């Protein structure tokens, strides 16, 4: 590297300044992560070069053996990470090292918790790992040249981690990037061979290309034999983890590899490593994360597996091998049946990709099934983070609908904790004799529906009801019509029929009571008018005076709220007003001769039923007026 030319000073993007302050002043607990991040970046640079060289072999120049080298200088107090990967042009150095994509930065800064260990774990996940260099360094130099550019088009980027950075054009014969860290006075212990080797073994043993350090020679006898020329030796295994036999891989190695590909520093909950031979040949290594990424629900979030073809890296985020509802699964797939020049367009469809997607989806679901069976507490953690995403499955994946349904968890009247811990198989195992339906109720929260009037007859008969309180649940039930041959029934919808759970005598008695109350039903309907579709005697109620039932083909409250929140037009629906003929309030209403008072009481019962269902009132002021009037009459 020779004379510098065209030197310029640039100011960091505002968000980078904030990030640098965090690195310099806040992350004390796990400083060695800087090495993990810089090695990971160097490995990515090698992957990118391999991929580009498939169509442009000249990019490899005279240096086809990709590697990473780590050096240290005790006297100068420096650590150097050198790779011969893709490298950067001057413009790329300014763009990549001076700014961060706005969306990622904003989310990163919002996600910071103040907990040093948690915040340190977020660094790689948000693609800002380079700046971790400033945890241990007060000055960082980067020398780089992009593959394909001339030696005279190298770039030197330099910063002290303050408000700005310098770039200059330099001569750099070697392709790739060399990062030099000038260590802070109190961090100079990192410039030790043993420290660096042990840290590299800990975090980067799984990296699929050699990480080399100079051989160190100790003692006077060895010094005599010390070779004149520097000897480099690999300090990692340097083989793609997924290509090794499962029996040779320790759990710790699987865990570290997960952290490398996911940039998530928590251990995964489970993994599945499989080699498929026969008509199709591929190897897959799939992981279930412990926690959800910050952008799990972002439409354009990164998702998909790392794709390799015959061990050559092709692309990150190959979305085509798993359905969208399994987007949280991390891992790699290495195929022998795809061509090396495969593109995203080619991957959109085709028999090979479709077959792999089917098999990998089943593999991922099997992994979740095993987790639920063998480690229920871990599955609870999974469900808390990814349950709502998995609920997209029945709509998206018809062939695996039953399998996905078996993995779903709900709250129910069986467990008063309100935790979503009940599997559909558990529910079926507890069904009453003669019960052939799966009963459920949707609502905004467990607290809102646990004492709902809709549950009264079920509590009386000891029938368990699933309580569905996620915003997605009513939408889910539009696609999940049955499980294990048994139909789902929304207990707030239509004219409730308990089938064999009601005796013939009970049914006959209900019909006779309904006939005796036809006149009252007509009076209430005349009062409520167009606000209701129908008024009838209820078979649901034992304690409450009235309830609003949803029409068979109408949208429920959850779906209406979901559509309203997204700005869509919601079709108008009219509920069915059901009343409990044996309730004292209904008996008083039936005996009321004053039509104004009858109208006020009917309206109060209607509004209260709407509130009990979790709905809001169209005219709350009039409800309060009527209620106050009634209270005054009662207190007179």
Swiss-Prot record:
Residues 345-561 are annotated as: B. GO terms for molecular function: ATP binding; ATP hydrolysis activity; ATP-dependent protein folding chaperone; unfolded protein binding. Signal peptide: none annotated. It comes from the Bacteria. The keyword Nucleotide-binding applies. Pfam families: HATPase_c_3, HSP90. GO terms for cellular component: cytoplasm. Keywords: ATP-binding, Chaperone, Cytoplasm, Nucleotide-binding, Stress response. It is found in: Cytoplasm. SUPFAM superfamilies: ATPase domain of HSP90 chaperone/DNA topoisomerase II/histidine kinase (SSF55874), HSP90 C-terminal domain (SSF110942), Ribosomal protein S5 domain 2-like (SSF54211). Its main location: cytoplasm. Residues 562-636 are annotated as: C. PANTHER family: HEAT SHOCK PROTEIN 90 FAMILY MEMBER (PTHR11528). Belongs to the heat shock protein 90 family. Molecular chaperone. Has ATPase activity. Homodimer. This is Chaperone protein HtpG.
């Amino acid at each position: 590297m020779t004379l510098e030319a065209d030197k310029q000073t640039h100011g960091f993007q505002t968000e980078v300044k904030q990030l640098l302050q965090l690195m310099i002043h806040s992350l004390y607990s796990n400083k060695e992560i800087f090495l993990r991040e810089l090695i990971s970046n160097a490995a990515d640079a090698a992957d990118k070069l391999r991929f580009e060289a498939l169509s442009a072999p000249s990019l490899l120049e005279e240096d086809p053996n990709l590697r990473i080298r780590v050096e240290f200088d005790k006297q100068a107090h420096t650590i150097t990470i050198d790779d011969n990967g893709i490298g950067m042009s001057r413009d790329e150095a300014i763009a990549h090292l001076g700014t961060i994509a706005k969306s990622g930065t904003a989310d990163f800064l919002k996600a910071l918790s103040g907990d040093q260990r948690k915040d340190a774990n977020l660094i790689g996940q948000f693609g800002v790992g380079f700046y971790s260099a400033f945890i241990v360094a007060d000055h960082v130099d980067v020398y780089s040249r992009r593959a394909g550019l001339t030696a005279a088009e190298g770039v030197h980027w330099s910063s002290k981690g303050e408000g700005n950075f310098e770039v200059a054009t330099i001569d750099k014969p070697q392709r790739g990037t060399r990062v030099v860290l000038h260590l802070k006075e109190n961090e100079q212990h990192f410039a030790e061979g043993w420290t660096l080797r042990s840290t590299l073994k800990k975090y980067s043993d799984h990296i699929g290309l050699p990480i080399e350090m100079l051989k160190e020679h100790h003692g006077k006898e060895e010094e005599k034999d010390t070779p004149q020329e520097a000897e480099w030796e690999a300090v990692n295994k340097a083989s793609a983890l997924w290509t090794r036999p499962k029996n040779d891989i320790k759990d710790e190695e699987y865990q570290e590899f997960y952290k490398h590909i996911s940039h998530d520093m928590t251990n995964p909950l489970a993994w599945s490593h499989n080699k498929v031979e026969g008509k199709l040949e591929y190897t897959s290594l799939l992981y279930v994360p412990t926690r959800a990424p910050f952008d799990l629900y972002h439409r354009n979030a990164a998702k998909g597996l790392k794709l390799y073809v015959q061990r050559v890296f092709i692309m990150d985020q190959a979305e085509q091998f798993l359905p969208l509802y399994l987007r949280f699964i991390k891992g790699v797939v290495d195929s022998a049946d795809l061509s090396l020049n495969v593109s995203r367009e080619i991957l959109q469809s085709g028999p090979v990709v479709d077959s792999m997607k089917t098999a990998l989806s089943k593999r991922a679901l099997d992994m979740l099934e095993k987790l639920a069976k063998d480690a229920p507490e871990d599955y609870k953690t999974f469900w808390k983070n990814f349950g709502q995403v998995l609920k997209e499955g029945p709509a998206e994946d018809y062939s695996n609908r039953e399998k996905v349904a078996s993995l779903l968890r709900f709250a129910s009247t069986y467990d008063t904790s309100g935790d979503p811990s009940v599997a559909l198989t558990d529910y079926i195992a507890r069904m009453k004799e003669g019960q052939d339906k799966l009963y459920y109720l949707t609502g905004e929260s467990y607290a809102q529906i646990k004492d709902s009037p809709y549950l009264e007859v079920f509590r009386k008969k000891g029938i368990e009801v699933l309580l569905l309180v996620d915003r997605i649940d009513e939408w889910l039930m539009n696609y999940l019509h049955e499980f294990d041959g048994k139909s789902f029934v929304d207990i707030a919808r239509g004219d409730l029929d308990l089938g064999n759970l009601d005796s013939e005598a009970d049914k006959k008695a209900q019909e006779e009571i309904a006939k005796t109350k036809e006149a009252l039903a007509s009076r209430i309907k005349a009062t409520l008018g167009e606000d209701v579709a129908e008024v009838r005697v209820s078979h649901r109620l034992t304690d409450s005076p009235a309830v609003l039932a949803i029409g068979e083909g109408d949208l429920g409250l959850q779906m209406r709220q979901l559509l309203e929140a997204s700005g869509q037009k919601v079709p108008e629906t009219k509920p069915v007003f059901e009343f409990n003929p044996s309730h004292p309030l209904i008996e008083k209403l039936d005996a009321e001769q004053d039509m104004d008072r009858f109208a006020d009481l009917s309206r109060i019962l209607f509004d209260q039923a709407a509130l009990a269902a979790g709905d809001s009132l169209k005219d709350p002021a009039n409800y309060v007026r009527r209620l106050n009037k009634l209270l005054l009459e009662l207190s007179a």
